[in-house]
Regions:
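A domain-start/cap signature at the N-terminus of enzymes
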Residues: 2, 8-19, 27-100, 202, ...
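The conserved beta1-alpha1 loop
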Residues: 104-105, 242
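Active-site machinery of serine-nucleophile hydrolases
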Residues: 109-171
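Short, proline-enriched alpha-helix->beta-strand connector loops that line the catalytic pocket
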Residues: 138, 233-238
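Gly/Ser-rich "nucleophile elbow"/oxyanion-hole loop immediately N-terminal to the catalytic nucleophile
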Residues: 156-197
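Primarily recognizes the serine-hydrolase "nucleophile elbow" in alpha/beta-hydrolase
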Residues: 190-233
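C-terminal catalytic histidine-bearing segment of alpha/beta-hydrolase fold enzymes
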Residues: 237, 241, 247-301
Length: 301
């Protein structure tokens, strides 16, 4: 079994890891490396152990211990656009130009308290970038906006609400915040990244479709269903995660998007966790030791 010390070490470095491959429903999920100019479609090694093994759970518990108190490092701010959007911002201890990572919360973060987008399942996607070892190697701004009406467009006259095509108002306002931060701080504009979980994952796909050639890379976890088919900004590196036991967002939504993106000429990375449900995917994805190194290796030309 992995030791506590080893779990902590793995959170800040790329481990030897293991390779995971699966084939389901006719979609090849094998993660063979396919070198390219940017090397973004070469699958990094995953964390040791199976998704539900004691080794993997130790890694998640180590992350929770390490990330305690990091919420307090986020500054509370608000943006006034078509409506008021609260957001949290972490500023790194550096004066040079550094990347910016934006995290879009899932439905559990809905509201206007400027807090829930940092708590519960959102701790992984917001705090991983703040871990001391990650800030030492990859200093960056971290933006966590909060919406009370979703990232994509919905028809709320229907029950349940129906997803609509087009640029989501929540996604658009969040990008206006990014544009403002680019003017206010020394942000490396070639290295702006977007990540999201569940409803936030749908927001990521919406941004890729409606703000092409803007992001250096994207990370999605069990992304919610939407009209965005995954082919937007097809040249942008994407690492997509999903659990095949997800009862909230069917795993077929990720499989279909990834298949469409590959057909359109993209080279996304797709990691599917066997036996993992909706809530379990985010912790596994954002504690993959190779994730920070992969993200920050991507940049726009």
């Amino acid at each position: 079994m992995i030791t506590r010390r080893e779990a902590v070490r793995l959170l800040g470095s790329v481990s030897a890891g293991v390779w995971f491959a699966a084939t389901q429903s006719g979609l090849n999920l094998s993660f063979a490396a396919n070198a390219s100019a940017s090397n973004y479609d070469s699958t990094p090694a995953l964390a040791p152990g199976t998704p539900t093994s004691p080794e993997r759970m130790a890694l998640i518990e180590a992350f929770k211990r390490q990330s305690e108190g990091l919420q307090d490092k986020f500054e509370a701010r608000t943006y006034k656009g078509d409506w008021v959007m609260p957001y949290r911002l972490f500023r790194p201890a550096t004066t040079g130009k550094v990347p910016l990572v934006m995290y879009l919360h899932g439905s559990g973060g809905l509201g206007d308290d400027n807090l829930k987008q940092l708590r519960f399942g959102n701790i992984f996607g917001t705090r991983v970038w703040l871990l001391p070892e990650n800030q030492k190697r990859f200093p960056c701004y971290v933006l966590a906006p909060q919406t009370d009406r979703g990232w994509i467009r919905y028809d709320f006259s229907q029950s349940p609400a129906k997803e609509l095509p087009g640029f989501g108002d929540g996604a658009r306002l969040a990008l206006e915040i990014v544009d403002g931060l680019r003017r206010e701080f020394a942000v490396d504009e070639r290295r702006i990244y977007v990540t999201g979980n569940s409803m936030g994952g749908a927001g990521v796909w919406n941004m890729l479709a409606n703000r092409p050639h803007f992001f250096a890379a994207a990370v999605t976890c069990c992304a919610g269903e939407s009209s965005d088919d995954g082919t937007g900004s097809v040249e942008t590196p994407v690492w997509d995660f999903h659990g095949d036991a997800d009862q909230v967002v069917p795993v077929s939504s990720s499989r279909d998007r990834i298949a469409a993106r590959r057909k359109a000429g993209g080279h996304p990375i797709y990691t599917e966790y066997p036996g993992v449900d909706h809530d379990g995917t985010t912790g596994l994805a954002f504690t993959e030791p190779a994730l920070p190194k992969w993200v920050f290796a991507q940049h726009r030309s």
